[in-house]
Amino acid sequence: MYKEGACLYRNPLRSKSDVKDWRMEGGGQISFDDHSLHLSHVQDEAHFVFWCPETFPDGIIVTWDFSPIEQPGLCMLFFAAAGIRGEDLFDPSLRKRTGTYPEYHSGDINALHLSYFRRKYAEERAFRTCNLRKSRGFHLAAMGADPLPSPDDADSPYRMKLIKDKGYVHFSINGLPILEWMDDGSTYGPVLTKGKIGFRQMAPMKAVYRDFAVHQAVRR
């Protein structure tokens, strides 16, 4: 249905210089073992979001390689993130964010958030799903089965692919469709368009990321 058009942003995530302009909110730390971005927590319960500095338009395909290293924890992607009045996500008029989840789903920003590795709590590990939510608010928009194994059994990396075009959202892992959703623009508020993208983790999760890219989404 969609193919990749022009490349809007590409980052191999292989060295510290690749993320020198990225912004950390909360208690996260980065390292670059094996020429890949390793994200982990500074201390217990130190959840965080690591933001790409670019503001992306609507109509995009987002791809990245993901490898789970240690659980429990949770991995999420924020996208189409901006202030509730259209401000840039880093506008100084917005309240300071420190990695605490309510700041992101019930604060002064709008965003879509895709939880694609939910292993923080026992009930999440017992019945694994990928969840798509829309904020402001804590609106569960779509769910899909999570095919990713526990870190000990992982054959990493896994290729993650997210399509966002107006109200349409589609997510797949290694080419396997996981969930899709069409935002009607009224049930949970207006359709979100341009905004920033960030990786969120909940401690004590450790994970590895590589080859992050954003392309224009072109309808076939």
Swiss-Prot record:
Superkingdom assignment: Bacteria
Full protein name: Uncharacterized protein YesU
Organism, as annotated: Bacillus subtilis (strain 168)
Residues spanning the signal sequence: none
Gene: yesU
Lineage: Bacteria, Bacillati, Bacillota, Bacilli, Bacillales
